């Protein structure tokens, strides 16, 4: 147990107040990442280009290839003096190796000078200028600048502009490089922002990293601060270092180059503040340890780290302010044992000073102060409902279990009282989770209640069987009472078997089955009862109604026989025959509709029959009219 006045510190997270402070780095190169990046660069040479990426990339990280002499021999043996690209790779790689000198003939020099022309591509101009610079050969910087500017107006890609920045860093400071420097602002405007955290070109990570490396190298060369905001630098940094595994040697080289300039330049050095250890590390002293590094995880030992203030997250009250961290080796420590923090969460605002180049040097740390909870004044009582008998109270001390059993029935209630205190400070605690669990020893049924504190922070749980019978499903029996205490700031969450309580419900309210029955047994099969069809009428009734319906037709035939049918005007003209056949067909269609067809099918056929019958009938009536007129 910690001595009084001390607490356990857990560092939970590194956050930022976005509305007040600048962005904080979310991605950087840890020591493990740096070693992995070095391993990505330390590959066997396959050609002069791969040798350049490997040698110069490792050099930017402060490392060397394993065998510098062998590497120099490889460069000399693979150099093609008639190829500008080959000369560029050889010049830059040999410059990164100590004692590796390469002699250049006049013909090769003339080749490089001839390549510095507006007829060459920006890439060729960059490689020629960098090769001349690497070999220590003279160059007319203003003429090279004119050729570069003229060619850049024809190549407006992001990569071409970045290579123009790289070229300018090899030219004389006496040349007017303003036109190239102004391209930086244009490139920044072409960056894409992702979620307010990342900033990169759509061309990808490699181009973004080369842009950062070229910008700071050129700005260090001309002595002017780059036109990039501090927040944008952090966003670029987050984008570049978000990737830890590299598919190509050139990609690893670009990240190494960007990391090198962000760690060492004259204007912007991002600060990375990292808690030492993980959230599971505990210390029986109130000490906060921070690692303050650059993007390569190299300690900024010359920095000064100060705590501006520490505020409680719950009350926003300031509990500590204006305190300096003490450098201990490569870390900075803040000992606040003399300050009595109550358990909970606190926001520590930390500032890193000591160099005006530092950016992202104000961060807010979320710190959790943990403690141990103690249970005091635990009383178990049975209270008579009509208060005719004085309450019976038994005091229990954690972690012991109360002796005997307690009864709760229709005549008396059961009550539990207790208080929670901070073991270290003695202050009262109100954890987030305070539960009373009752477990039926026979059926396994469990019922959980929340214990609430009163205005004096005394927790009370009272069991009235008449009010709680629904929760228990009126299941009488012996229940084990557990007290559960939990909170994110507690080192010792508690599950305490407090006592056995006999709960009795009236027998008439007892259920036929208890809740503990197996809820997953197969249920009784449901028998579906469909509606029975209506009974049909007797055959005699059906036949009677059929005869009644046909009676008018029988009457028609009877009258025709008695009076006589007038068929004198009937002709056997085609229109007459078609009309009567069509009429008969429509009557037949009605029968088929009744027995087989639906309405839409019937309408389709009726339209055809009706049209033919209509035309035939019209023709027939016209002929009858002509015949009458003639007579």
Curated annotation (Swiss-Prot):
The Gene Ontology biological process annotation of the record reads: protein modification process; protein N-linked glycosylation
The identity of this protein, by name, is Dolichyl-diphosphooligosaccharide--protein glycosyltransferase subunit 2
Report membrane topology: Multi-pass membrane protein
Which InterPro entries does the record cross-reference, listed alphabetically? Ribophorin_II_2nd, Ribophorin_II_3rd, Ribophorin_II_C, Ribophorin_II_N, Swp1
Domain of life from the UniProt record = Eukaryota
Show which residues sit on the Lumenal side of the membrane.
23-540, 593-596
What tissues express this gene product? Expressed in all tissues tested.
Q: What would be the name of the gene that encodes this protein? A: RPN2
Any Gene Ontology CC annotation: oligosaccharyltransferase complex A
Q: Which residues are glycosylated?
A: 106
- Grouped into one coarse class, the protein's main location is endoplasmic reticulum
Query: What's the stated role of this polypeptide?
Result: Subunit of the oligosaccharyl transferase (OST) complex that catalyzes the initial transfer of a defined glycan (Glc(3)Man(9)GlcNAc(2) in eukaryotes) from the lipid carrier dolichol-pyrophosphate to an asparagine residue within an Asn-X-Ser/Thr consensus motif in nascent polypeptide chains, the first step in protein N-glycosylation. N-glycosylation occurs cotranslationally and the complex associates with the Sec61 complex at the channel-forming translocon complex that mediates protein translocation across the endoplasmic reticulum (ER). All subunits are required for a maximal enzyme activity.
| Location in chain, cross-link Glycyl lysine isopeptide (Lys-Gly) (interchain with G-Cter in ubiquitin) | 154
Topology feature Cytoplasmic, residues: 562-571, 618-631
Cellular localisation: Endoplasmic reticulum; Endoplasmic reticulum membrane
Which organism does this record belong to? Homo sapiens
The family this protein is said to belong to: Belongs to the SWP1 family.
Supply the alphabetized keyword list: Endoplasmic reticulum, Glycoprotein, Isopeptide bond, Membrane, Signal, Transmembrane, Transmembrane helix, Ubl conjugation
* Leader sequence segment: 1-22
Self-association and partners: Component of the oligosaccharyltransferase (OST) complex. OST exists in two different complex forms which contain common core subunits RPN1, RPN2, OST48, OST4, DAD1 and TMEM258, either STT3A or STT3B as catalytic subunits, and form-specific accessory subunits. STT3A complex assembly occurs through the formation of 3 subcomplexes. Subcomplex 1 contains RPN1 and TMEM258, subcomplex 2 contains the STT3A-specific subunits STT3A, DC2/OSTC, and KCP2 as well as the core subunit OST4, and subcomplex 3 contains RPN2, DAD1, and OST48.
Any Pfam family: Ribophorin_II_2nd
Pathway involvement of the protein, from the record: Protein modification; protein glycosylation
Q: Where does the chain cross the membrane?
A: 541-561, 572-592, 597-617
């Amino acid at each position: 147990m910690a001595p009084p006045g001390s607490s356990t510190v857990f560092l939970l997270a590194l956050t930022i107040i976005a509305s007040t402070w600048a962005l904080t780095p979310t991605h950087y190169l840890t020591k493990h990442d740096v070693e992995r990046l070095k391993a990505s660069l330390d590959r066997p040479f396959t050609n002069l280009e791969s040798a350049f990426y490997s040698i110069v990339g490792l050099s930017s990280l402060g490392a060397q290839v394993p065998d510098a002499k062998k590497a120099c021999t490889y460069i000399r043996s693979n150099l093609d003096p008639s190829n500008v690209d080959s000369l560029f790779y050889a010049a830059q790689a040999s410059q990164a190796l100590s004692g590796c000198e390469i002699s250049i003939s006049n013909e090769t020099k003339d080749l490089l000078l001839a390549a510095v022309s507006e007829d060459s591509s920006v890439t060729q101009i960059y490689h020629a200028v960098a090769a001349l610079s690497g070999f220590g050969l003279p160059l007319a910087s203003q003429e090279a600048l004119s050729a570069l500017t003229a060619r850049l107006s024809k190549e407006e890609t992001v990569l071409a502009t970045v290579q123009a920045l790289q070229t300018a860093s090899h030219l004389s400071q006496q040349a007017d490089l303003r036109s190239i420097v102004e391209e930086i602002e244009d490139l920044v405007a072409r960056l894409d922002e992702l979620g307010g955290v990342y900033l990169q070109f759509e061309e990808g990570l490699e181009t973004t990293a080369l842009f950062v490396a070229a910008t700071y190298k050129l700005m260090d060369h001309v002595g002017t601060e780059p036109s990039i905001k501090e927040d944008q630098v952090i966003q670029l940094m987050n984008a570049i270092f978000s990737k830890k595994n590299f598919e190509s040697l050139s990609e690893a080289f670009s990240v190494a180059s960007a990391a090198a300039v962000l760690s060492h330049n004259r204007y912007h050095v991002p600060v990375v503040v990292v808690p030492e250890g993980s959230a599971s590390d505990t210390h029986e002293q109130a000490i906060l340890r921070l690692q303050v590094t650059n993007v390569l995880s190299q300690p900024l030992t010359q920095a000064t780290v100060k705590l501006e203030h520490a505020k409680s997250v719950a009350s926003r009250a300031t509990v500590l302010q204006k305190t300096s961290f003490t450098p201990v080796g490569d870390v900075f420590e803040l000992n606040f044992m003399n300050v009595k923090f109550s358990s909970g969460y606190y926001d520590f605002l930390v500032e890193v000073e000591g160099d005006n180049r530092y950016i992202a040097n104000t961060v807010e740390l979320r710190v959790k102060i943990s403690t141990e909870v103690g249970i005091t004044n635990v009383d178990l009582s049975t209270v008579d409902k009509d208060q005719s008998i004085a309450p019976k109270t038994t005091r229990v001390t954690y972690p012991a279990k109360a002796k005997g059993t307690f009864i709760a029935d229709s005549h008396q209630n059961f009550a539990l009282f207790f208080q929670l205190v901070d073991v270290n400070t003695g202050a009262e605690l109100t954890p987030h989770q305070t539960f009373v669990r009752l477990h039926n020893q026979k059926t396994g049924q469990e019922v959980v209640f929340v214990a609430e504190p009163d205005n004096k922070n005394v927790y009370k749980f009272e069991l009235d069987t008449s009010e709680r019978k629904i929760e228990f499903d009126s299941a009488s029996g012996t229940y084990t009472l557990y007290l559960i205490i939990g909170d994110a700031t507690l080192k010792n969450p508690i599950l305490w078997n407090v006592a056995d309580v006999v709960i009795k419900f009236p027998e008439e309210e007892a259920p036929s089955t208890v809740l503990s029955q197996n809820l997953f047994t197969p249920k009784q099969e449901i028998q579906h009862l469909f509606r029975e069809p209506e009974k049909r009428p007797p055959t005699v009734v059906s036949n009677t109604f059929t005869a009644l319906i046909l009676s008018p037709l029988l009457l028609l035939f009877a009258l025709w026989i008695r009076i006589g049918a007038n068929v004198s005007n009937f002709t056997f003209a085609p229109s007459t025959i078609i009309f009567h056949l069509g009429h008969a067909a429509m009557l037949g269609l009605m029968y088929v509709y009744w027995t087989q067809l639906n309405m839409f099918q019937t309408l389709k056929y009726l339209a055809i029959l009706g049209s033919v019958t209509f035309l035939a009938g019209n023709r027939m009536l016209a002929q009858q009219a002509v015949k009458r007129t003639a007579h």
